[in-house]
Amino acid sequence: MFEIHPVKKVSVVIPVYNEQESLPELIRRTTTACESLGKEYEILLIDDGSSDNSAHMLVEASQAENSHIVSILLNRNYGQHSAIMAGFSHVTGDLIITLDADLQNPPEEIPRLVAKADEGYDVVGTVRQNRQDSWFRKTASKMINRLIQRTTGKAMGDYGCMLRAYRRHIVDAMLHCHERSTFIPILANIFARRAIEIPVHHAEREYGESKYSFMRLINLMYDLVTCLTTTPLRMLSLLGSIIAIGGFSIAVLLVILRLTFGPQWAAEGVFMLFAVLFTFIGAQFIGMGLLGEYIGRIYTDVRARPRYFVQQVIRPSSKENE
Protein backbone atom coordinates (compact mmCIF):
# COMPACT_ATOMS: atom_id res chain seq x y z
CA MET A 1 0.00 0.00 0.00
CA PHE A 2 1.11 3.55 -0.75
CA GLU A 3 1.45 5.93 2.16
CA ILE A 4 -1.10 8.75 2.16
CA HIS A 5 0.55 12.13 2.65
CA PRO A 6 -1.61 14.97 3.98
CA VAL A 7 -1.82 18.11 1.86
CA LYS A 8 0.52 20.81 3.18
CA LYS A 9 0.30 23.47 0.48
CA VAL A 10 -2.41 24.14 -2.10
CA SER A 11 -1.80 25.79 -5.48
CA VAL A 12 -4.85 27.12 -7.34
CA VAL A 13 -4.28 27.52 -11.10
CA ILE A 14 -6.71 29.79 -12.98
CA PRO A 15 -6.40 30.65 -16.71
CA VAL A 16 -7.67 34.14 -17.54
CA TYR A 17 -8.74 35.43 -20.95
CA ASN A 18 -10.60 38.76 -21.15
CA GLU A 19 -12.17 38.40 -17.70
CA GLN A 20 -11.64 41.90 -16.30
CA GLU A 21 -15.25 42.13 -15.04
CA SER A 22 -15.06 38.95 -12.96
CA LEU A 23 -11.45 39.26 -11.70
CA PRO A 24 -12.06 41.30 -8.51
CA GLU A 25 -14.79 38.90 -7.36
CA LEU A 26 -12.74 35.88 -8.45
CA ILE A 27 -9.68 36.97 -6.47
CA ARG A 28 -11.71 37.86 -3.38
CA ARG A 29 -13.69 34.62 -3.27
CA THR A 30 -10.76 32.37 -4.13
CA THR A 31 -8.58 34.00 -1.47
CA THR A 32 -11.33 33.62 1.13
CA ALA A 33 -11.80 29.94 0.24
CA CYS A 34 -8.06 29.28 0.49
CA GLU A 35 -7.76 31.12 3.81
CA SER A 36 -10.40 28.80 5.27
CA LEU A 37 -8.20 25.76 4.55
CA GLY A 38 -5.74 26.49 7.33
CA LYS A 39 -2.91 25.49 4.98
CA GLU A 40 -0.28 27.28 2.96
CA TYR A 41 -1.59 28.33 -0.43
CA GLU A 42 -0.85 30.25 -3.60
CA ILE A 43 -3.12 31.41 -6.41
CA LEU A 44 -1.62 31.36 -9.91
CA LEU A 45 -3.48 33.49 -12.45
CA ILE A 46 -2.35 32.97 -16.05
CA ASP A 47 -3.20 35.72 -18.51
CA ASP A 48 -3.70 33.96 -21.85
CA GLY A 49 -3.05 36.96 -24.09
CA SER A 50 -6.06 39.02 -22.98
CA SER A 51 -6.93 42.09 -25.05
CA ASP A 52 -8.71 43.86 -22.19
CA ASN A 53 -7.32 45.12 -18.87
CA SER A 54 -6.95 41.66 -17.30
CA ALA A 55 -3.14 41.50 -17.39
CA HIS A 56 -2.76 44.88 -15.66
CA MET A 57 -5.23 43.84 -12.98
CA LEU A 58 -3.30 40.63 -12.34
CA VAL A 59 -0.04 42.53 -11.91
CA GLU A 60 -1.68 44.86 -9.40
CA ALA A 61 -3.12 41.90 -7.49
CA SER A 62 0.32 40.28 -7.21
CA GLN A 63 1.89 43.50 -5.97
CA ALA A 64 -0.75 44.12 -3.30
CA GLU A 65 0.21 43.85 0.35
CA ASN A 66 0.11 40.31 1.82
CA SER A 67 -0.76 38.93 -1.61
CA HIS A 68 -0.68 35.19 -2.35
CA ILE A 69 -1.16 35.72 -6.07
CA VAL A 70 1.36 34.74 -8.74
CA SER A 71 0.62 36.32 -12.13
CA ILE A 72 1.91 34.60 -15.26
CA LEU A 73 1.63 36.62 -18.46
CA LEU A 74 1.74 34.77 -21.79
CA ASN A 75 2.74 36.72 -24.88
CA ARG A 76 -0.42 35.74 -26.80
CA ASN A 77 -3.47 33.50 -26.65
CA TYR A 78 -2.56 29.80 -26.59
CA GLY A 79 -5.80 28.28 -25.33
CA GLN A 80 -7.14 27.19 -21.97
CA HIS A 81 -5.21 23.96 -21.54
CA SER A 82 -1.86 25.41 -22.63
CA ALA A 83 -2.37 28.25 -20.15
CA ILE A 84 -3.04 25.75 -17.38
CA MET A 85 0.12 23.84 -18.29
CA ALA A 86 2.02 27.13 -18.01
CA GLY A 87 0.62 27.48 -14.51
CA PHE A 88 1.56 23.89 -13.66
CA SER A 89 5.19 24.65 -14.49
CA HIS A 90 5.31 27.32 -11.76
CA VAL A 91 3.37 25.72 -8.90
CA THR A 92 5.02 24.98 -5.56
CA GLY A 93 2.16 23.20 -3.78
CA ASP A 94 1.68 19.47 -3.31
CA LEU A 95 -2.00 19.68 -4.34
CA ILE A 96 -2.91 21.64 -7.46
CA ILE A 97 -6.47 22.79 -8.13
CA THR A 98 -7.64 24.12 -11.49
CA LEU A 99 -10.52 26.57 -11.71
CA ASP A 100 -12.16 28.61 -14.46
CA ALA A 101 -12.21 32.39 -14.12
CA ASP A 102 -15.88 32.83 -15.03
CA LEU A 103 -17.10 31.91 -11.49
CA GLN A 104 -19.59 29.37 -12.81
CA ASN A 105 -17.80 26.86 -10.58
CA PRO A 106 -17.74 28.57 -7.18
CA PRO A 107 -14.31 28.86 -5.50
CA GLU A 108 -16.11 27.95 -2.28
CA GLU A 109 -15.95 24.31 -3.45
CA ILE A 110 -12.15 24.27 -3.07
CA PRO A 111 -12.15 23.04 0.58
CA ARG A 112 -14.26 20.03 -0.44
CA LEU A 113 -11.73 19.03 -3.10
CA VAL A 114 -8.85 19.40 -0.63
CA ALA A 115 -10.68 17.28 1.96
CA LYS A 116 -11.31 14.54 -0.61
CA ALA A 117 -7.68 14.62 -1.78
CA ASP A 118 -6.61 14.22 1.85
CA GLU A 119 -8.33 10.83 1.76
CA GLY A 120 -5.59 9.64 -0.59
CA TYR A 121 -6.96 10.31 -4.07
CA ASP A 122 -4.58 11.29 -6.87
CA VAL A 123 -7.25 13.10 -8.88
CA VAL A 124 -10.49 14.63 -7.61
CA GLY A 125 -12.86 15.48 -10.45
CA THR A 126 -16.22 17.21 -10.25
CA VAL A 127 -19.66 16.85 -11.82
CA ARG A 128 -21.68 20.01 -12.35
CA GLN A 129 -25.15 19.86 -10.81
CA ASN A 130 -28.06 21.80 -12.37
CA ARG A 131 -25.89 23.20 -15.16
CA GLN A 132 -26.70 26.80 -16.04
CA ASP A 133 -25.43 26.62 -19.63
CA SER A 134 -27.36 26.86 -22.88
CA TRP A 135 -28.97 23.80 -24.48
CA PHE A 136 -26.24 23.78 -27.12
CA ARG A 137 -23.43 23.77 -24.54
CA LYS A 138 -25.09 20.99 -22.54
CA THR A 139 -25.65 18.85 -25.63
CA ALA A 140 -22.09 19.37 -26.90
CA SER A 141 -20.73 18.53 -23.45
CA LYS A 142 -22.72 15.27 -23.30
CA MET A 143 -21.43 14.25 -26.73
CA ILE A 144 -17.83 14.99 -25.76
CA ASN A 145 -18.15 13.12 -22.46
CA ARG A 146 -19.56 10.04 -24.20
CA LEU A 147 -16.83 10.20 -26.83
CA ILE A 148 -14.14 10.32 -24.15
CA GLN A 149 -15.69 7.50 -22.14
CA ARG A 150 -15.87 5.25 -25.20
CA THR A 151 -12.33 5.94 -26.38
CA THR A 152 -10.59 5.90 -22.99
CA GLY A 153 -12.70 3.44 -21.04
CA LYS A 154 -12.62 5.84 -18.07
CA ALA A 155 -16.09 6.20 -16.57
CA MET A 156 -15.80 9.85 -15.51
CA GLY A 157 -19.03 11.79 -15.77
CA ASP A 158 -18.01 15.38 -16.56
CA TYR A 159 -14.68 15.89 -18.30
CA GLY A 160 -15.63 19.44 -19.27
CA CYS A 161 -15.63 20.76 -15.71
CA MET A 162 -12.19 22.21 -14.99
CA LEU A 163 -12.69 22.46 -11.23
CA ARG A 164 -10.35 19.59 -10.36
CA ALA A 165 -7.61 18.68 -7.90
CA TYR A 166 -4.37 16.90 -8.79
CA ARG A 167 -1.62 15.57 -6.59
CA ARG A 168 1.82 16.97 -7.37
CA HIS A 169 3.16 13.73 -8.88
CA ILE A 170 0.26 13.72 -11.38
CA VAL A 171 1.10 17.27 -12.47
CA ASP A 172 4.80 16.38 -12.76
CA ALA A 173 3.88 13.41 -14.96
CA MET A 174 1.78 15.65 -17.23
CA LEU A 175 4.63 18.15 -17.54
CA HIS A 176 6.82 15.34 -18.88
CA CYS A 177 4.40 14.78 -21.78
CA HIS A 178 5.43 16.62 -24.92
CA GLU A 179 2.39 16.41 -27.19
CA ARG A 180 1.15 19.80 -28.34
CA SER A 181 -2.58 18.98 -28.09
CA THR A 182 -3.35 18.35 -24.44
CA PHE A 183 -6.67 17.73 -22.71
CA ILE A 184 -5.69 17.88 -19.05
CA PRO A 185 -8.50 15.90 -17.33
CA ILE A 186 -7.92 12.90 -19.61
CA LEU A 187 -4.14 13.12 -19.41
CA ALA A 188 -4.31 13.20 -15.61
CA ASN A 189 -6.52 10.11 -15.45
CA ILE A 190 -3.95 8.18 -17.48
CA PHE A 191 -1.47 8.56 -14.60
CA ALA A 192 -3.89 8.41 -11.66
CA ARG A 193 -4.03 5.31 -9.48
CA ARG A 194 -7.04 6.56 -7.52
CA ALA A 195 -9.54 9.02 -9.00
CA ILE A 196 -12.97 10.11 -7.85
CA GLU A 197 -15.66 12.62 -8.78
CA ILE A 198 -17.81 14.70 -6.46
CA PRO A 199 -20.90 16.82 -7.28
CA VAL A 200 -20.44 20.59 -7.24
CA HIS A 201 -22.69 23.58 -7.66
CA HIS A 202 -22.84 25.34 -11.03
CA ALA A 203 -23.84 29.00 -11.31
CA GLU A 204 -24.90 31.19 -14.20
CA ARG A 205 -22.21 33.22 -15.92
CA GLU A 206 -22.51 36.77 -14.58
CA TYR A 207 -19.85 38.52 -16.68
CA GLY A 208 -19.00 38.31 -20.36
CA GLU A 209 -19.60 35.37 -22.68
CA SER A 210 -18.21 31.88 -23.01
CA LYS A 211 -14.89 31.71 -24.87
CA TYR A 212 -15.91 28.40 -26.48
CA SER A 213 -17.72 29.27 -29.70
CA PHE A 214 -19.30 26.67 -31.99
CA MET A 215 -16.12 26.33 -34.07
CA ARG A 216 -13.91 26.03 -30.98
CA LEU A 217 -16.12 23.20 -29.73
CA ILE A 218 -15.78 21.47 -33.11
CA ASN A 219 -12.00 21.89 -32.94
CA LEU A 220 -12.04 20.50 -29.41
CA MET A 221 -13.87 17.38 -30.59
CA TYR A 222 -11.29 16.89 -33.36
CA ASP A 223 -8.51 17.33 -30.81
CA LEU A 224 -10.05 14.74 -28.53
CA VAL A 225 -10.55 12.21 -31.31
CA THR A 226 -7.05 12.51 -32.73
CA CYS A 227 -5.03 12.93 -29.53
CA LEU A 228 -6.71 10.18 -27.50
CA THR A 229 -6.77 7.13 -29.71
CA THR A 230 -6.16 5.59 -33.13
CA THR A 231 -9.60 3.95 -33.06
CA PRO A 232 -10.95 6.23 -35.85
CA LEU A 233 -8.24 4.91 -38.17
CA ARG A 234 -9.29 1.34 -37.41
CA MET A 235 -12.92 2.28 -37.94
CA LEU A 236 -11.92 3.87 -41.23
CA SER A 237 -10.35 0.59 -42.37
CA LEU A 238 -13.49 -1.27 -41.31
CA LEU A 239 -15.71 1.23 -43.11
CA GLY A 240 -13.57 0.90 -46.24
CA SER A 241 -13.91 -2.87 -46.13
CA ILE A 242 -17.69 -2.64 -45.74
CA ILE A 243 -17.97 -0.20 -48.64
CA ALA A 244 -15.74 -2.38 -50.83
CA ILE A 245 -17.83 -5.47 -50.09
CA GLY A 246 -21.03 -3.50 -50.64
CA GLY A 247 -19.75 -2.09 -53.92
CA PHE A 248 -18.74 -5.53 -55.17
CA SER A 249 -22.13 -6.96 -54.17
CA ILE A 250 -23.96 -4.17 -55.99
CA ALA A 251 -21.80 -4.75 -59.08
CA VAL A 252 -22.69 -8.46 -59.09
CA LEU A 253 -26.37 -7.60 -58.58
CA LEU A 254 -26.29 -5.14 -61.50
CA VAL A 255 -24.78 -7.78 -63.80
CA ILE A 256 -27.44 -10.31 -62.78
CA LEU A 257 -30.25 -7.80 -63.34
CA ARG A 258 -28.75 -6.80 -66.68
CA LEU A 259 -28.69 -10.44 -67.84
CA THR A 260 -32.17 -11.09 -66.47
CA PHE A 261 -34.10 -8.04 -67.65
CA GLY A 262 -32.05 -6.97 -70.64
CA PRO A 263 -30.46 -3.68 -71.67
CA GLN A 264 -33.64 -1.65 -71.08
CA TRP A 265 -33.27 -2.06 -67.34
CA ALA A 266 -29.58 -1.10 -67.44
CA ALA A 267 -30.39 2.36 -68.75
CA GLU A 268 -32.61 2.94 -65.77
CA GLY A 269 -29.79 1.97 -63.40
CA VAL A 270 -27.63 4.96 -64.25
CA PHE A 271 -28.72 6.86 -61.17
CA MET A 272 -27.87 3.91 -58.94
CA LEU A 273 -24.38 3.89 -60.40
CA PHE A 274 -24.04 7.57 -59.63
CA ALA A 275 -25.23 6.91 -56.08
CA VAL A 276 -22.59 4.22 -55.65
CA LEU A 277 -19.95 6.52 -57.11
CA PHE A 278 -20.82 9.36 -54.76
CA THR A 279 -20.80 6.94 -51.82
CA PHE A 280 -17.25 5.95 -52.65
CA ILE A 281 -16.17 9.55 -53.16
CA GLY A 282 -17.73 10.61 -49.85
CA ALA A 283 -16.04 7.75 -48.01
CA GLN A 284 -12.70 8.71 -49.54
CA PHE A 285 -13.04 12.32 -48.43
CA ILE A 286 -13.95 11.24 -44.90
CA GLY A 287 -10.90 9.00 -44.81
CA MET A 288 -8.63 11.69 -46.21
CA GLY A 289 -9.90 14.16 -43.62
CA LEU A 290 -9.18 11.83 -40.71
CA LEU A 291 -5.77 10.92 -42.05
CA GLY A 292 -5.04 14.60 -42.55
CA GLU A 293 -5.88 15.32 -38.90
CA TYR A 294 -3.48 12.63 -37.70
CA ILE A 295 -0.74 13.73 -40.09
CA GLY A 296 -1.24 17.32 -38.96
CA ARG A 297 -0.80 16.25 -35.33
CA ILE A 298 2.39 14.38 -36.22
CA TYR A 299 3.70 17.42 -38.11
CA THR A 300 2.93 19.72 -35.17
CA ASP A 301 4.64 17.41 -32.66
CA VAL A 302 7.70 16.89 -34.87
CA ARG A 303 8.27 20.66 -35.06
CA ALA A 304 8.45 20.57 -31.24
CA ARG A 305 7.44 24.18 -30.79
CA PRO A 306 6.71 25.12 -27.17
CA ARG A 307 3.11 24.96 -25.98
CA TYR A 308 3.36 28.54 -24.74
CA PHE A 309 5.79 31.38 -24.17
CA VAL A 310 5.85 33.05 -20.76
CA GLN A 311 6.51 36.76 -21.12
CA GLN A 312 6.64 37.60 -17.42
CA VAL A 313 6.01 36.09 -13.99
CA ILE A 314 5.03 38.45 -11.18
CA ARG A 315 5.20 36.98 -7.70
CA PRO A 316 4.03 38.64 -4.47
CA SER A 317 6.14 41.64 -3.47
CA SER A 318 7.99 39.60 -0.85
CA LYS A 319 9.38 37.40 -3.64
CA GLU A 320 11.54 38.24 -6.61
CA ASN A 321 9.87 38.67 -10.00
CA GLU A 322 11.03 36.68 -13.02
UniProtKB/Swiss-Prot annotation:
Entry's Gene Ontology molecular function annotations: phosphotransferase activity, for other substituted phosphate groups; undecaprenyl-phosphate 4-deoxy-4-formamido-L-arabinose transferase activity
Membrane topology category: Multi-pass membrane protein
Cellular location(s): Cell inner membrane
Catalytic function, reaction form: UDP-4-deoxy-4-formamido-beta-L-arabinose + di-trans,octa-cis-undecaprenyl phosphate = 4-deoxy-4-formamido-alpha-L-arabinopyranosyl di-trans,octa-cis-undecaprenyl phosphate + UDP
Predominant subcellular localization, coarse grouping: membrane
Ranges facing Periplasmic side: 257-269
Protein name: Undecaprenyl-phosphate 4-deoxy-4-formamido-L-arabinose transferase
Gene assigned in the entry: arnC
